[in-house]
């Protein structure tokens, strides 16, 4: 009986609906919202994963770049070491040659002294021999003088003539005797021969002395050149210490760069932290760049807000020419930075600038379309007002800029309370430029502090 009652109650409960339609709708709505949030979260996670992948790739490229730099530094160090070894070898060779030249110069000086002594001895001998010759000549003249006196006497007597005649008869071979006497007189004496021999030796010694003097002069010149080369090589050897110190500094910088790369996991302008200031292209150059023009126009835009009017075409043409010039200058800067093998933030600034330029051109097109859609009368009145205002400004101020004229023109379409869209775009451009400039200054100060600590 109880079982039957329970079965009936269970059947009654099965017939009744156990859920509410409103609750079911709420559950379905919650499930849909949950799925939507999950899908959004999934897309966000995919974006973050993609971003992490790109950062990982950039870090890998940076690591490869640093390894290449380390290899280049090692090669440079090896080359410097080879150069130092060659300089040491050449310095030793020059020292040896210098010592040899010094020894040769000393030997030549000793030889010159010995030759001068021998020359002096020979000169004394010559003087002595000349004195002896003069004495002999004087003695010979003293012997010949009595014979001459006899010849100068008057003619001998008859007895003397007879004796002479008898002597001539005894000497049959008179001509032979005369020849012997003449030959004896013609033969030089041994003193004269010795004198001539000594004169010849003196001339030879004088020639040798002149040659030795010439050799000495040449040796002194060579000695001076060797001393100069030795001093230059000593200076080069002194400069090798500076080269070694520079190589050690570069190795320390590379080690610090590696530590920074390992310590900093988030990739926030890592390239700017690792590249020195010399590889950056300065924003402020002697020629007025695009960034300077944009910074100079900031206070004017804040003083007098720009409004859309009939002079918008003038503004667009001026802005277009400025944009083209600025884009060319940025391209030139990028080429210079690539040539210097430096990685800078100009690429990011250029991409931001190109995106903002596209937005600005779209806004200008919209403004021109809205102006074309206006009535012809409104355009004429706005142009007349612009001409009147320009005339007044010309009378008061002879020179007026295009930006000030555009700011004075009335706005026919938009209300004065709502600012135009390109004004917000300019604000965004200036904020981006200021932000990038602040980041660059921070990175430079950080790098300078690191280099000063190192």
UniProtKB/Swiss-Prot annotation:
Record's keyword annotation contains Phosphoprotein: yes
GO cellular component terms given for this protein: cytoplasm
Residue numbers carrying Phosphoserine: 311
Domain of life: Eukaryota
Key words, A-Z: Coiled coil, Phosphoprotein
Chain spans, region Disordered: 134-153
Coiled-coil spans in chain: 44-142, 192-265, 346-380
Keyword Signal: no
Stated family: Belongs to the CDR2 family.
Name of this protein: Cerebellar degeneration-related protein 2
């Amino acid at each position: 009986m109880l079982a039957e009652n329970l079965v009936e109650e269970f059947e009654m409960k099965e017939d009744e609906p156990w859920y509410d339609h409103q609750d079911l709708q709420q559950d379905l709505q919650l499930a849909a919202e949950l799925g939507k949030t999950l899908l959004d979260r999934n897309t966000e996670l995919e974006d973050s994963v993609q971003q992490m992948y790109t950062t990982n790739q950039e870090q890998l490229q940076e690591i490869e770049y640093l390894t290449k730099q380390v290899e280049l530094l090692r090669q440079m160090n090896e080359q410097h070491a080879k150069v130092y070894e060659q300089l040491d070898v050449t310095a030793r060779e020059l020292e040896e040659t210098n010592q040899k030249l010094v020894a040769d110069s000393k030997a030549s000086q000793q030889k010159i002294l010995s030759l001068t002594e021998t020359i002096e001895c020979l000169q004394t001998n010559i003087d002595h021999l000349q004195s002896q010759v003069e004495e002999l000549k004087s003695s010979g003249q003293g012997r010949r003088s009595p014979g001459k006196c006899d010849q100068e006497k008057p003619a001998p007597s008859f007895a003397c003539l007879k004796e002479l005649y008898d002597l001539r008869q005894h000497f049959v071979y008179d001509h032979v005797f005369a020849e012997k006497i003449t030959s004896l007189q013609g033969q030089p004496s041994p003193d004269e021969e010795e004198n001539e021999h000594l004169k010849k030796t003196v001339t030879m010694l004088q020639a040798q002395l002149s040659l030795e003097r010439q050799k000495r002069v040449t040796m002194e010149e060579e000695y001076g050149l060797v001393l100069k080369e030795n001093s230059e090589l000593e200076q080069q050897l002194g400069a090798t210490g500076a080269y070694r110190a520079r190589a050690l500094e570069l190795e320390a910088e590379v080690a610090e760069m590696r530590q920074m790369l390992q310590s900093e996991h988030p990739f926030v302008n890592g390239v700017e932290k690792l590249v020195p200031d010399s590889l950056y292209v300065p924003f402020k150059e002697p020629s007025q760049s695009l960034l300077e023009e944009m910074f100079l126009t900031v206070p004017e835009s804040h003083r007098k807000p720009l409004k859309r009017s009939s002079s918008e075409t003038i503004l667009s043409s001026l802005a277009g020419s400025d944009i083209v010039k600025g884009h060319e200058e940025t391209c030139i800067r990028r080429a210079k930075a690539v040539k210097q093998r430096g990685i800078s933030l100009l690429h990011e600034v250029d991409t931001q600038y190109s995106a903002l330029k596209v937005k600005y051109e779209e806004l200008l097109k919209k403004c021109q379309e809205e102006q074309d859609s206006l009535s012809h009368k409104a355009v004429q009145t706005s142009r007349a007002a612009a001409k009147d205002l320009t005339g007044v400004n010309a009378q008061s101020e002879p020179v007026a800029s295009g930006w000030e004229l555009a700011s004075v023109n009335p706005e026919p379409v938009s209300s004065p309370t709502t600012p135009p869209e390109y004004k917000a775009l300019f604000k965004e451009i200036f904020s981006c430029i200021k932000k990038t400039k602040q980041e660059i200054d921070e990175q430079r100060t950080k790098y300078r502090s690191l280099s000063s600590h190192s």
